[in-house]
């Protein structure tokens, strides 16, 4: 199969939704969770990683099939186009099971999360909470335990903003925009003629945003203001769950959150 990043059909043939040249996303079954892919000439960024070892493995296989098709020229692993054919970086938007438990299968990739996100992924209390949430939402205990056994802390914590250089002028920005949905919310901006913003669960389209016990409601609306500042009026905003939206949708959700929690933005 011949795939070019400029041709949306290549993404769709592999089950992914094209968002911009070199940028796409996959909506996963069961929880309708989004994972994103940003392809550069020398590397690729995955945004979130699925809910289990099995789901992470599927994501990795599909993403790397797409990357190989988009970078058909051979190259040594770790250099030039060779590293552009595999996932070299993973950004975790927040430490909830449906977004992080698949990260353990991306050996060799650099993993990024908001500062402090390592604690709920590696501490005993954090792992117990992750497991309980996963099982309560339908993941089998065995699948949860298998992923948690392999899960490690992110290698890089983002304090403010951090730019990745994926080669070929592809430079996504990782932005610590929270707290809001959790205490550790990371967004990803992919600049371009029409920017793409991966919002994590700060924005949800398929239902009202979910505020669990680890949410920070007093800061959530302000986090959406930061997302709007990142992307601007013309960006494509990618929720953690549901269809892609525009800036007007994000503003409406910000207003709803402000009313719901009695906070300003």
Regions picked out by a protein language model, each given a short descriptive name:
Residues 51-52, 115-119, 203, 262:
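Short, acidic/turn-prone active-site loops that include or flank metal/cofactor-
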Residues 246-265:
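Binuclear metal-ion centers of metallo-dependent hydrolases, dominated by the metallo-beta-lactamase
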Residues 2-18, 169-171:
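N-terminal amphipathic/basic leader segments beginning at the initiator methionine
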Residues 22, 38, 48, 63, ...:
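Divalent metal-coordination and catalytic microenvironments
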Residues 53-113, 157, 229-236:
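Active-site metal-binding motif and surrounding structural segment of the metallo-beta-lactamase
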Residues 44-45, 51-53, 69, 119-176, 225-228, ...:
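Metallo-beta-lactamase
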Residues 13-64, 186-200:
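Conserved beta-strand hairpin/beta-sheet module of binuclear metal-dependent hydrolase folds
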């Amino acid at each position: 199969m011949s795939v070019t990043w400029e041709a949306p059909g290549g993404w769709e043939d592999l089950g992914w939704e094209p968002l911009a040249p070199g940028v796409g996303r996959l909506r996963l079954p069961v929880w309708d969770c989004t994972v994103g892919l940003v392809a550069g000439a020398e590397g690729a960024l995955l945004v979130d990683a699925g809910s289990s070892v099995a789901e992470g493995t599927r994501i990795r296989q599909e993403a790397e099939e797409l990357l190989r098709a988009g970078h058909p020229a051979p190259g040594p692993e770790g250099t030039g186009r060779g590293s552009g054919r595999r996932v070299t970086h993973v950004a975790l938007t927040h430490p909830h099971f449906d977004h992080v438990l698949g990260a353990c299968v991306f050996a060799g990739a650099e993993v990024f999360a908001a500062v402090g996100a390592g604690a709920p992924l590696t501490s005993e209390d954090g792992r117990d909470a992750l497991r309980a949430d996963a099982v309560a939402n339908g993941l089998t205990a065995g699948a949860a335990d298998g992923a948690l056994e392999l899960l490690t802390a992110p290698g890089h914590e983002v304090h403010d903003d951090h730019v990745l250089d994926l080669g070929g002028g592809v430079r996504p920005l990782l932005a610590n925009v929270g707290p809001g949905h959790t205490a550790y919310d990371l967004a990803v901006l992919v600049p371009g003629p029409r920017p793409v913003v991966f919002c994590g669960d700060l924005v949800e389209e398929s239902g009202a945003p979910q505020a669990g016990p680890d949410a920070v409601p007093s800061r959530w609306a302000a986090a959406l203001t930061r997302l709007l500042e990142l992307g601007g009026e013309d960006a494509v905003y990618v929720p953690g769950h549901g269809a892609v939206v525009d800036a007007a949708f994000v503003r409406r959700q910000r207003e709803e959150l402000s009313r719901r929690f009695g906070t300003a933005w």
